[in-house]
Amino acid sequence: MTDTQDKNYIIALDQGTTSSRAIIFDRDANVVGTSQREFAQHYPQAGWVEHDPMEIFATQSATMVEALAQAGISHAQVAALGITNQRETTVVWDKETGRPVYNAIVWQCRRSTEICAQLKRDGHEGYIRETTGLVTDPYFSGTKLKWILDNVDGARERAERGELLFGTIDTWLIWKFTGGKVHVTDYTNASRTLMFNIHSLQWDDKLLQILGIPRQMLPEVRPSSEVYGHTKSGIAIAGIAGDQQSALFGQMCVEPGQAKNTYGTGCFLLMNTGDQAVKSSHGLLTTIACGPRGEVAYALEGAVFNGGSTVQWLRDELKIVNDALDTEYFASKVKDSNGVYLVPAFTGLGAPYWDPYARGALFGLTRGVKVDHIIRAALESIAYQTRDVLDAMQQDCGQRLSELRVDGGAVANNFLMQFQADILGTCVERPQMRETTALGAAYLAGLACGFWSGLDELRDKAIIEREFSPQLDETQKEKLYAGWKKAVERTRDWEDHEA
């Protein structure tokens, strides 16, 4: 706890995949200052994605200065700083100079596909799943780190001599902000590395041995809400969470069975499972979330590959809408989709199908089908895919969803939100505060330093702007969903491949 009596603001740093942002909140959790800076994406080969860690730090530092200036406040008025970040992205740097030995390898980067294939051939897949809650995939940090050690000249030897440090983006930023004094991460970010035992809450020696990672490179793992250190200007760094877990906390989904969906290019669904690390039989990830006081809780996570990107396809490739915002108007012009289903399996199907060979398709076309029906079917596909994942979550954990809390760009679409409630048969709650990811980091930092007293105070600030209640009867709902399931089956295993 720190004395926050005269300090009336919390800064949240939201370090994302394409931009760095800073958002300043007051005691009522209102936004009083913001700044955002984009940075370069590097694509050295097909399927490879990199960022410059120094540019990430520079843009993130600049946004903090700019947000403070916009709000007209000084560092001395800030009680604490919370960090939320793109997860899995991997940085390795020299402990003495603070210079990265290679660009940050981004979560989207697929360069370690062959490393993952070798892990599977060597029979490690089951142990990885059991220990980390994750699947053996290039998405996660461990194989990215192995690639750097194997491919950057001298990196492995330097790491073994204790000269190099590893971190996800939160760790890198904190190390830089504290002038190299603090090398730390939180449980949520550690749980995405493929090196962390989510049951013992320790780095896993067997996994480090399998991947060939020297343990001394790794940061200390701490709870998501505590004071880790101070910036050079004296601000307490007091909260860390990966972006999706931060949004879950920002939505106050801290009890078992509470869930949120972030509607972006794809959709990220997380359901809090409390102190139970639920093993999924539907290919969902088991991950660490934040409990009521920022302590360890568990969650199930599932991703929908194509959400907002389906609407972008209507706009950019089919050119049947000029603006994503127009889809609500066109979808509402017709009473239903006229039997049309769009399955947007452009890059295969994610949870719970896991079919990389599925391909997108339109079903139910007749001469009576208009553009409006196709636009409506595209929006409905986002809601159907969300139900696919939530049904799997409910089956895995035996918890009935109480309500779905939503955030992300597409939640402004009232048609989509209403249809989501209809097809789930569950209330959908849209918060007044849309900055839920940054808010989660601010809450974690504010709780750690006594800026806010506890969960009850935070719940009072969680104003629901609109609640969408289900309006379809059970028979109608299940008939529509059965049509979706039938359409999905027809898209399965479409692309030719070797068995």
Curated annotation (Swiss-Prot):
Protein family membership: Belongs to the FGGY kinase family.
Matching Pfam families: FGGY_C, FGGY_N
Gene Ontology MF annotations: ATP binding; glycerol kinase activity
UniProt enzyme class: transferase
A Gene Ontology cellular-component term: cytosol
Record PROSITE patterns: FGGY_KINASES_1, FGGY_KINASES_2
Keywords: ATP-binding, Glycerol metabolism, Kinase, Nucleotide-binding, Transferase
Residues reported to bind ATP: 17-19, 265, 308, 312, 409
Pathway it works in: Polyol metabolism; glycerol degradation via glycerol kinase pathway; sn-glycerol 3-phosphate from glycerol: step 1/1
Family matches, as SUPFAM superfamilies: Actin-like ATPase domain
EC number: 2.7.1.30
General function of this protein: Key enzyme in the regulation of glycerol uptake and metabolism. Catalyzes the phosphorylation of glycerol to yield sn-glycerol 3-phosphate.
The keyword Glycosyltransferase is assigned to this record: no
Reaction it catalyzes: glycerol + ATP = sn-glycerol 3-phosphate + ADP + H(+)
Binding sites annotated in the UniProt record for ADP: 17, 21, 265, 308, 409, 413
Name of the protein in its database record: Glycerol kinase
Description of how activity is regulated: Inhibited by fructose 1,6-bisphosphate (FBP).
InterPro entries found in the cross-reference section: ATPase_NBD, Carb_kinase_FGGY, Carb_kinase_FGGY_CS, FGGY_C, FGGY_N, Glycerol_kin
Binding site for glycerol: 87-88, 139, 243-244
Binding site for sn-glycerol 3-phosphate: 17, 87-88, 139, 243
Biological process, per Gene Ontology: glycerol catabolic process; glycerol metabolic process; glycerol-3-phosphate metabolic process
Keyword Nucleotide-binding: yes
Gene: glpK
Entry-linked PANTHER family: GLYCEROL KINASE, SUGAR KINASE
Upper taxonomic lineage: Bacteria, Pseudomonadati, Pseudomonadota, Gammaproteobacteria, Pseudomonadales
